[in-house]
């Protein structure tokens, strides 16, 4: 929810909070290591009024962080939120370069993640090589979704693979498509 346009004072506070968040990140990371918790800290950010600090982390398993929460509350003296994020959110937060050589879509312009299925790769006649159709997050490439409808529409105009067509007065079998 956007309440208003940020003014100079808000921007100054935001920049101060970013510096504060970097220090808080390091402190939290150290406390996690000391506590031997199976979680990987990804990011830390403060609300504009610094009344709450949000720590984002990944973990393969459920983590009991009650003791961690107590330790963090005693250090930071504000509300603490521990937010577990998935692989796509992690990639969005950290950023990086995709297989295509461009900045990650999720980090540069995607607002929400749409469902992507292996059928989209099949529909686009891509080789089902998981390494080639997976993003840096380990999930199917988000861009498979962008072109899916276009491939569905254009494939309607072509004969199906395995069907027979007439070409230059000859019966020919369709063995492949290159869309």
Describe each region flagged by the PLM.
Residues 1-121, 125-127:
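Acidic-enriched and Gly/Ser
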Residues 96, 100-167, 172-175:
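Conserved glycine-centered short motifs in functionally critical loops
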Residues 178-179:
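Basic/aromatic-rich interaction segments and small domains that mediate binding to polyanionic partners
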